[in-house]
Structures are given as C-alpha cells and as structure tokens.
Amino acid sequence: MKIAVYGKGGIGKSTTSCNISIALARRGGKVLQIGCDPKHDSTFTLTGFLIPTIIDTLQSKDYHYEEIWPEDVIHKGYGGVDCVEAGGPPAGAGCGGYVVGETVKLLKELNAFYEYDIILFDVLGDVVCGGLAAPLNYADYCVIITDNGFDALFAANRIAVSIGEKTRTHLLRLAGLVGNRTSKRDLIDGYVEVCPMPVIEVLPLIEDIRISRVKGKTLFEMVGSEPSLNYVCEYYLNIADQILSQPEGIVPKEIPDRKFFSLLSDSYLSPINDGKQGKNQENLLGFTMV
C-alpha cells in the first residue's frame, strides 16, 4: 500500500506523517517514509538528524546507479520505520516532481520499492503544478492534513481537485482528511458537508505535538519519558487502523474556488448578521471579500 500525504505548508504534515508511520509499524507493517521536499526534513523526528538525500547521493556517485547500495539512501528511524529523503533541485531551478521520479527509480533499481508493506510519501506544501502531484502517480490513497482554518481548508480543496484529476488515469482514491491541532471542527464539518469526504481523525490542540518537532522526536518516543502523552498516540493508531482497513476511498467532488470562498466566508459572517460575536468572527476571517 502506498499513501501520499498532502496539506498546506506548515500545517504539520511531517510531524503527522512520522507519527502515522510509527503507528503503522506498531500494527505490524514494514514501513518506508519518503520525504518529498527540498528541505529534506520530513523524517527528522524519526531519525533525529537530517539524513543525506537521494539527490545528494546520486550526485556524489555521478548518477551511476550501480554504485549505490540500499544503506546509502535508506536510513533506520525510530520504531523500525525506514526513511528516505528525496531532496530536491537548487532553489529556483529544476522540478521537484523529477526528483520524486528519480527516487522511485533508484529504489526500484535497488529492489527496495516493493519490499515494504506500506510506503508513505510526505509531500511539500500545496499542489500548484503537475510536478508536485508526482507522488500521486504511485499512491493508492491520499490523506490530506488540515486544520479548522480557512487557508488550510482552501489548500485541502485544491489538493482534492488534483486528486480528482489524477483519478482519471490512476487507481487513486482520497482516504480522507486529518485535522491537526485544532480545538474546533466547525469549518471542517461545513466543508465535508458540501464536498463529501471522510474525516479520519481530528487531533486535539496539544502543544506537545508542536514541541515534538522541536525536540526531534515523535510522540511515541516522547511517551517513554512522558507517559501522560500515551493518549495522544491513540489518535495516530486510530488513523493507522483506518488506513490498514483499506477503505473504499472517494473521488472528491470539485468545488470551484469562488464557491469555496463563499462557503467559508458565510460560515464566519452568519453570526455577524445575527449581531452576535461579529468582531471576533471578523478577526478570525483574516481577509476582506471584495
């Protein structure tokens, strides 16, 4: 099974991906996480350091694939999760999608791509071009990370459109949304009411999730010294269980951008029309409709 994780930049995809990877491994799967971001920090909380990238290794070998061994590019992470960082071209040059393709090509050359029960692609930022959608070419499922805010849900909607486009030629389905670090879910619920899709899990607004990233540890590793965090790990285990159940998934319905703006702005502005909480809701909106 191959899973692509997408979401707005900075929403917590890598932190969530690492914890999901460990949860999948805890359920008995042999897991590989592939970071698809030039920052090459996807697997940081699994390994505790920035591992060498595929592109770095290929360049050091002058792109002679036959000189590269699995241990050159596959690094062991916490919980038995194997880790790969694709890396990327220099800033302002090249295509991230090409790098993902080279990564998969090399792993196939090493007979490693099909050795895993689950491969999780952690993909950078929003989908703005075909290159960044490249991991969808290999995925069985896509999981979108969001929160209860406008920007994250707007990005989620754009990603859903990309998934719908890919389903025309690939056996890809959207597994659902994961809400990350949010105390409310009203906007998430409003969105999935108009664009039906599963909400796999909503993670609570817990500061330790953010702190884990700074510490370079997953929540599962932090539990060793902070047993009180064990309940947070149950959220990730629930996500893993739902993924492992091989859900039917969906082909997302496309919502045009203007309709999406109206949908969420109405959610904020309705209380204003009622004369209730107007000022607070306006501050939450964070933009002006023109």
Swiss-Prot record:
Residues reported to bind [4Fe-4S] cluster: C95, C129
Cofactor(s) the protein requires to work: [4Fe-4S] cluster
Pfam family, one: Fer4_NifH
One Gene Ontology cellular component: chloroplast
UniProt: Mg(2+) binding residues: S14
PROSITE patterns assigned: NIFH_FRXC_1, NIFH_FRXC_3
UniProt family annotation: Belongs to the NifH/BchL/ChlL family.
PANTHER family the record matches: LIGHT-INDEPENDENT PROTOCHLOROPHYLLIDE REDUCTASE IRON-SULFUR ATP-BINDING PROTEIN
Name assigned to this protein: Light-independent protochlorophyllide reductase iron-sulfur ATP-binding protein
Gene (name only): chlL
